[in-house]
Regions:
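Hydrophobic h-region of N-terminal signal peptides that target proteins for export
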Residues: 9-17
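Sec-dependent signal peptide recognition
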Residues: 1-8
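Short, flexible active-site loop motifs that bind/organize anionic cofactors or intermediates
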Residues: 26, 197, 325
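Acidic, Gly/Ser/Thr-rich repeat motifs that build Ca2+-stabilized beta-propeller blades
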Residues: 16-161, 212, 218-225, 276-314, ...
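Short, conserved clusters of charged catalytic residues that mark active-site
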Residues: 28-31, 202, 327
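Beta-propeller domain segments
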Residues: 78-80, 88-90, 158-322, 330, ...
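Short, solvent-exposed aromatic-acidic interface loops
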Residues: 102, 130-133, 191-194, 249, ...
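Repeated scaffold domains used in trafficking and secretory/extracellular systems
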Residues: 332-334
Length: 358
């Protein structure tokens, strides 16, 4: 059992001078741009919560509707969620993956879908995998996508039911790992057990951020805690991340701790805990020369406290080091890195910004 690297955040002086960075607005008018992904230096796919997949030209600002996702539920936290380009895909007809909240006859769940972009049209849309994560709530869907060694990973929240976190008979509260065709890899940790074979890790509450750092070969996730207790986790094969037996947060209705303990044997401790919560969205590990001060650091979007959270990684320990864009007053929904090394982020007011040094 490892020691938790926790950071108590109560209006501490982490803010960077506003003169160091600025947000350059490159587009607006989207309906909650939940996921953004570059096709090349000039073009970006934008997932809007209402089910619209759009194409944005960064230079001109031109927006084009590519596709309207069928059977998408948009109530509450549901909607069209993440978008991710398959690495090393054919540039002429790139393959793209999506997650979304899918309506079914039994209720709403999370689905992983794929399509190809041909002649500025999204074609061949199909569900690769529909999760068994149906509840009657409209919250905690996750969901983010990452690719590692020709496998696709995607996260699913506990769907508003705490017991799902420790129940490996459901896909809710997990990170799943699949082959690109939706089949189960032979080396998945629960392939031969009674648990769902698609599960890579479990015990998650609502992981809305995930990023694979190619430089270190590490898969990171960030998830919402309850009242306090947001977490950054280093994702390991077959690991249990504790929810809801373990939590650093408190009940919404009172000052009582959530769960049985803050740490338990055989459950992974988070690498960083946010108290109070920042309500994290997506995250990246920045590698590049456009912002020398940020190289090798985690950048995470914050919804509740409306900023970009900068986290240093030193000898395996995580420490919050800075907060960027606090004066912008925007809920940061997604964050990504362009092919030429610039950080872009989307906000719930329908805008997309580029982070720039002054």
């Amino acid at each position: 059992m490892r020691t938790i690297t926790a950071t108590l955040l109560a209006c501490l002086a982490f803010s960077i001078d506003a003169a160091d960075y600025r947000a350059n607005e490159v587009a607006n008018g989207f309906q909650i741009p939940w996921g953004i992904e570059f096709l090349d230096k000039q073009q970006m796919i934008v997932n809007e919560k209402n089910g619209t997949v759009s194409l944005l030209n960064i230079a001109s600002g031109k927006q084009q509707t590519l596709f309207k996702v069928p059977n998408v539920n948009t109530s509450g936290q549901a909607g069209l969620l993440d978008v991710a380009l398959v690495p090393n895909t054919a540039p002429q007809n790139p393959q793209v993956f999506f997650t979304y909240s899918k309506r079914t006859d039994k209720g709403n769940t999370v689905a992983l879908a794929t399509a190809q972009l041909k002649n500025n049209q999204l074609v061949g849309w199909k569900d690769v995998f529909v999760a068994d994560a149906i509840t009657d709530t409209s919250r905690h869907y996750g969901s983010r996508i990452a690719f590692v060694d020709d496998k696709v990973y995607f996260s699913i929240g506990d769907r508003g039911e705490r017991d799902n976190g420790q129940d490996t008979q459901t896909h809710a509260g997990t990170i799943l790992r699949l082959n690109l065709d939706g089949s189960v890899p032979q080396d998945n940790p629960f392939k031969t057990s009674e648990a769902r074979p698609e599960i890579w890790s479990y015990g998650h509450r609502n992981p809305q951020g995930m990023f694979y750092d190619e430089a270190t070969k590490q898969l990171w996730s960030i998830e919402h805690g309850p009242r306090g207790g947001d977490e950054i986790n280093l994702i390991r094969k077959g690991a249990n991340y504790g929810w809801a037996k373990v939590s650093q947060g408190k009940e919404y209705w009172g000052p009582l701790d959530v769960g049985e303990a803050k740490s338990l044997p055989n459950m992974e401790d988070p690498k960083l805990v946010y108290i109070p919560s920042i309500a994290p969205s997506n995250m990246v590990v920045y590698r590049g020369d456009k912002y020398p001060e940020l190289d090798g650091k985690i950048l995470a979007g914050a919804l509740k406290l409306a900023h970009i959270n900068v986290v240093s990684i030193e000898n395996g320990k995580l420490t919050e080091s800075k907060r960027l864009m606090e004066n912008l007053g925007e809920r940061v929904r997604d964050i990504t890195i362009s092919p030429d090394g610039y950080v872009y982020f989307s906000t719930d007011t329908g805008k997309i910004f580029r982070l720039e040094e002054k």
